[in-house]
C-alpha cells in the first residue's frame, strides 16, 4: 500500500498512540498480573492499596483534566492495586518517568518510518505528563512535555529528516499550547480552537473578528517555534459530532465552514464523509460510520460493519455516487475549493492578513506569498452582500 501511495505522490501519515496502550498489551498484562515481579511494572503507574486511601479516593490528584473523571483504575484480577488510565480502564497510561518507555516508543516510531510511513498523527499529545487538575498547567509539566516531544522528534529525524509530526493537543487556551510548538517540539498541532470558532462563525453568520485573533495566534506560535510552526486546520474529527449535524442539517452553513478552513493557512485535514455531508452524533459508533460511496447499501468495497443509519435516513443523497455529477453538491464544493488550493500558490503556502470590509456578515482576509496575493471574501449570510475593495489594502 505504501509503495502504491508513494507512486501516486501520496504521503501516508499514521496514527501513533504513545500516551497509553490497550489493556490487552503484553506489557500491561504482565505488569498488572505480576505487579511485584514484572519487569514491566514501571512501564505504567501502578500503586499498591497501602499507598492510597480507598475510602478517600476522590482528592484533586484523582481528577482528570475534564473535571470529576477518575484517572485511577482497578484491575479485577489484581485486587489491592490501582493504575493510571486517563481514558478508562482499557487504556492504561504509559509511565514517561521511566527512561525505558522513552526508548520503547522511539523505537516504535522508527520501526514504522523504516517501513515507509511519512509521519505520524500523535494521539493525546498533551497527556504524556500531567493528567491531574492540580499539576497539568504547571511550568514543570509544560517543560517535561516539551522535552519529550523534542526527544521524540530527534529520534524520528534520525530515520527521516523530513518526517511530518502533528500533535493532537486538545486545548482551547492557545497560551497553554505554546510549549508544544516551542523550539522544535511539535511544529504542527491540530487547531481545535479555530475549528470551534469556524463552526460558530458559519452557523451564526457573523465573522466575530476571528481573523484578527487567528493572526495573533500565528504570530505567537511563529515566534515560539522560530518560524517553523504550521497550523493543521479541520472542522471536526472522530471524537466529535460531525459538521453537518453541528449545523443541524443546514448545507449552506456546512459549505461556508468548508470555504473558510480550506482557504486558510496550514495543512488541512478532512474527516472522511465530511465532503458529502455525512451526519453523525455521539456515541462514537455514530460518528465513525462507513464511508458512503453508493446510494444503495451495496457496492464494491463497501463495508457492512455498521448500517449507516444517518446516511440512509437521507435517502442515499449523502453519498459520493449521488453527488459526483451534481455541480452544486457538497462533494463538488469541496473539490472546487481543493483545486483552488492546489492551483493558487498563495492559498496553499501563503501567509494571512486581516482584511476588514466593515461588514460582520463577511469573512475576509488576504493570502499572500512574495509574488502573489489573493483576497478571500466569504459571504456568511443567505443574502446578497456588496463590499468595497480598496486596492491599497490588498497587498497587491
Residue positions per predicted region:
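Short, well-ordered coil/turn segments that N-cap beta-strands
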Residues: 6-10, 116-118, 160-163, 186, ...
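Beta-strand-rich binding/interaction modules
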Residues: 384-396
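Core domains of carbohydrate- and sulfate-ester-processing enzymes
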Residues: 29-85, 197-223, 288-316
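Loop/helix patches that line or flank the sugar-binding groove of alpha-linked glycan CAZymes
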Residues: 153-159, 171, 180-181, 197, ...
Amino acid at each position: 500500500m505504501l509503495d502504491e501511495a508513494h507512486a501516486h505522490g501520496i504521503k501516508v501519515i499514521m496514527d501513533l498512540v504513545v500516551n497509553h496502550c490497550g489493556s490487552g498489551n503484553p506489557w500491561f498484562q504482565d505488569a498488572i498480573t505480576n505487579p511485584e515481579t514484572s519487569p514491566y511494572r514501571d512501564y505504567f503507574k501502578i500503586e499498591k492499596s497501602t499507598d492510597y486511601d480507598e475510602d478517600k479516593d476522590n482528592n484533586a490528584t484523582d481528577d482528570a483534566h475534564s473535571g470529576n473523571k477518575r484517572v485511577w483504575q482497578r484491575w479485577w484480577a489484581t485486587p489491592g492495586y490501582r493504575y493510571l488510565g486517563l481514558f478508562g480502564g482499557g487504556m492504561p497510561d504509559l509511565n514517561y518517568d521511566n527512561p525505558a518507555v522513552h526508548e520503547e516508543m522511539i523505537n516504535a516510531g522508527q520501526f514504522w518510518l523504516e517501513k515507509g510511513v511519512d509521519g505520524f498523527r500523535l494521539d493525546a499529545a498533551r497527556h504524556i505528563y500531567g493528567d491531574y487538575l492540580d499539576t497539568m498547567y504547571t511550568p514543570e509539566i509544560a517543560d517535561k512535555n516539551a522535552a519529550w516531544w523534542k526527544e521524540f522528534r530527534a529520534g524520528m529525524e534520525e530515520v527521516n529528516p523530513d518526517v511530518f509530526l502533528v500533535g493532537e493537543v486538545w486545548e482551547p487556551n492557545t497560551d497553554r499550547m505554546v510549549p508544544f510548538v516551542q523550539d522544535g517540539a511539535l511544529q504542527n498541532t491540530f487547531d481545535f480552537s479555530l475549528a470551534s470558532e469556524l463552526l460558530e462563525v458559519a452557523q451564526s453568520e457573523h465573522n466575530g473578528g476571528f481573523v484578527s485573533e487567528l493572526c495573533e495566534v500565528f504570530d505567537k506560535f511563529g515566534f515560539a517555534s522560530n518560524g517553523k510552526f504550521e497550523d493543521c486546520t479541520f472542522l471536526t474529527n472522530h471524537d466529535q459530532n460531525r459538521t453537518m449535524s453541528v449545523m443541524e442539517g443546514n448545507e449552506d452553513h456546512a459549505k461556508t465552514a468548508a470555504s473558510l478552513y480550506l482557504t486558510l493557512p496550514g495543512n488541512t485535514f478532512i474527516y472522511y464523509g465530511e465532503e458529502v455531508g455525512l451526519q453523525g452524533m455521539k456515541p462514537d459508533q455514530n460518528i465513525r460510520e462507513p464511508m458512503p460511496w453508493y446510494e444503495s447499501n451495496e457496492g464494491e468495497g463497501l463495508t457492512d460493519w455498521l448500517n449507516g443509519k444517518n446516511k440512509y435516513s437521507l435517502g442515499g443523497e449523502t453519498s459520493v455516487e449521488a453527488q459526483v455529477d451534481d455541480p452544486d453538491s457538497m462533494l463538488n464544493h469541496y473539490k472546487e475549493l481543493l483545486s483552488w488550493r492546489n492551483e493558487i500558490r498563495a492559498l496553499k503556502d501563503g501567509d494571512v492578513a486581516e482584511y476588514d470590509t466593515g461588514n460582520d456578515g463577511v469573512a475576509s482576509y488576504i493570502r499572500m506569498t512574495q509574488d502573489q496575493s489573493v483576497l478571500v471574501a466569504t459571504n456568511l449570510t443567505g443574502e446578497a452582500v456588496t463590499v468595497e475593495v480598496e486596492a491599497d489594502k490588498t497587498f497587491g
